[in-house]
Swiss-Prot record:
Keyword Oxidoreductase on entry: no
Function as written in the Swiss-Prot or TrEMBL entry: Catalyzes the deamination of dCTP to dUTP.
Catalytic activity: dCTP + H2O + H(+) = dUTP + NH4(+)
Pathway(s): Pyrimidine metabolism; dUMP biosynthesis; dUMP from dCTP (dUTP route): step 1/2
Chain positions covered by the region annotation Disordered: 171-193
InterPro entries membership: dCTP_deaminase, dUTPase-like_sf, dUTPase_trimeric
Biological classification of the source: Bacteria, Pseudomonadati, Pseudomonadota, Gammaproteobacteria, Alteromonadales
Keyword Transmembrane: no
SS bond list: none
Signal peptide start-end: none
GO molecular function: dCTP deaminase activity; nucleotide binding
Species this chain originates from: Shewanella oneidensis (strain ATCC 700550 / JCM 31522 / CIP 106686 / LMG 19005 / NCIMB 14063 / MR-1)
Gene giving rise to this polypeptide: dcd
Family membership noted in the UniProt record: Belongs to the dCTP deaminase family.
This protein's name: dCTP deaminase
Length: 193
């Protein structure tokens, strides 16, 4: 069952769910808690690889990814990152989130931003039980105008679902967890599959 605002506040109070920095009560609504945009972004460099063979040998996949991904771009508070129509960029939440082994989280973009063409997560919106770290956002601008994104703006909302029991393989205990403890806009690690 999804946690209510009262249950979210209780989970934050007793440390079952940890969100740092802790959101104020205004950020918690019926079944969700708002998250804000961090200041780190990555973009795809144009035409630096003809294609990426997602099922190719891992070394070739990684080499192609290294060619197409930018280094981390730091945007200071008060400045803006511009996402142009048709562009995909990676970003990171301002908050770090820690979940126990019996709660799964879900990230939703804001309807107000979607109505302007901004997709906050292209497909990856599940936050696994045992997750610990910041959440990477996969932004896509499907609108007609560039969008100015500023650090610490409200970018989405997390909601939480209690499972029938703890999972046997929480994310932070898995040896093959590619994004464990991520703190910045980590690029795809598909070559590690």
């Amino acid at each position: 069952m999804r946690l209510t605002d009262i249950e979210i506040e209780q989970a934050l109070d007793n440390g079952t769910i940890v969100i740092e920095p802790r959101p104020n009560n205004d950020a918690i609504s019926g079944v969700s808690v708002d998250v804000r945009l961090g200041g780190q972004f990555r973009v795809f460099k144009d035409h630096t690889a003809p294609f990426i063979d997602l099922s190719g040998p891992s070394g070739e996949v990684q080499a192609a990814l290294d060619r197409v991904m930018s280094e981390i771009i730091e945007i200071p508070d008060g400045e803006a990152f511009f996402l142009h129509p048709g562009e995909l960029a990676l970003a990171v939440t301002y908050e770090s989130v820690t979940l126990p082994a019996d709660i799964v989280g879900w990230l939703d973009g804001r309807s107000s931003l979607a109505r302007l063409g901004l997709m906050v997560h292209v497909t990856a919106h599940r936050i696994d039980p045992g997750w610990q770290g910041k959440i990477v956002l996969e932004f896509y601008n499907s609108g007609k105008l560039p969008l100015a994104l500023r650090p610490r703006m409200t970018i989405g909302a997390l909601n939480f679902e209690r499972l029938s029991g703890p999972v046997a393989r929480p994310y932070n205990k898995r040896k093959n967890a590619k994004y464990k403890d991520q703190q910045d806009a980590v690029a795809s690690r598909i070559s590690q599959d």
